[in-house]
């Protein structure tokens, strides 16, 4: 009986293999393919590679099969032959990881020191900086020196520290005697401007022995920009030393604008600055003298400097300062200083009309406001509200029937499956490739297709890629409508306002993370989430990972928005600014304006360009969402419009 057991087990194993083979042969349905895909991934994660090898061949028709191939290749990239990687890249030209793989394998071939093989694999410049450095080193290694030196120069001219792979390229370039001394100095300047003190020190330390005096001066300046006057007086006046002095001077001005202001004549004399270079220093200081704490002498000096400036952005900042102070005379003066091109911006056309109305020139003012109303966005809606007229949204309609050719093909099939598996960010990469390769009319159809599939973020992404600004339905889908209905019920904030905030924050990508750690649809910081959960007794919150779940994010996000909305008297202008820049800053801005200005002036005078644009967008987006909900779509409520700020 015991002797029969091995035979029995061999028979069972053969039967299992036969059943598996039969299953492989007939695994045609999408549901079966998805199940097998999940099984393969699970086996892979458990390092059951025999199971992976057995099951993969039966999944070649599944749209995400190339991702399995990619994993197989990259798991053992050090031992992959170039032909295998080349075949994969060529077979999947639109697959996002294939482009990543190309750069990775260039670096692998560099590790092998297979320079000819590297150039055969990648005849064109690869995508990443590290791979490019290896590519141009391969050019040098194979005798293509001119191309190598040009590539080295292009990679050299940055204030960032480059990958270690670039060191050997830069070393052979320097040793060849072909490195341009001006390029060397330019990188020091760029590093200084980027605040990369470590790189400045390294580069200065590598300068030839005969340049040790200037090298020492550069290092001293990088370590303490307050030495700028000593630097200016002890180094010869050259374009390089003037540029270095200007960068250091900007750092001084950030710390002590008055000290910088008084320093200008000495710098001008020491470095023999011309009027244009001198004005650049004045502009730097003028930017720092826009607060409420400047003296009368500083204010006069600032305005004299701006009056001579050619910087449009600086003059615009001065216009906004006049708006925030309720200084009508200053508003007129500084608007007049703007160049003609800048005066055509929506905001400055509106304020020109505002001044005309004040002078009784109603016909001219109304002509400007009516012209603005033909456009889209914040100021066109403001113009309508100022005139007491209804604003008409222009909405372009995408074709109801999407061309079937656009919805077929491997890219769209992969997008569908990635969205099924909730791999939103990978799907976005695939979608971006697909949309980018299409005509504008096809992009509109793709936006509509995504809209119909409830791929809200992909719908928005297609309208952005195609600049389909009047396709408002696809740009502003009623995403997660049920969740927003539920979590705004019983709150003072409207559903449309909460959705406008979410649309501005994430463009409806539920998996997006900001560089500073904000997560999900309403871009919530972990600390804010913890505080809000406690304040509102929100149950079942376990940690920041849940912020990528739409329901959790909307629950916490709408609660926090309700909190700031109530803090600021149910005013969306203040609440939106606070959501973006923090409640403390909004209180400071309110204290500065001191009830002297109207709502539009307050928005335009917000000193942070990001927050200013944020508030304008949210108010406009709220109006769009109210339109799609069949509600009144005036930009501001009566209380927001009529109060003083």
Swiss-Prot record:
Domain of life: Bacteria
List of catalytic residues: 505
GO MF terms, alphabetically ordered: hydrolase activity, hydrolyzing O-glycosyl compounds; peptidoglycan lytic transglycosylase activity
Subcellular location, record wording: Periplasm
Signal peptide start and end residues: 1-27
Gene3D superfamilies, per database record: 1.10.530.10, Bacterial muramidases, Lytic transglycosylase, superhelical linker domain
Name of the protein: Soluble lytic murein transglycosylase
Organism field: Salmonella typhimurium (strain LT2 / SGSC1412 / ATCC 700720)
Lineage: Bacteria, Pseudomonadati, Pseudomonadota, Gammaproteobacteria, Enterobacterales
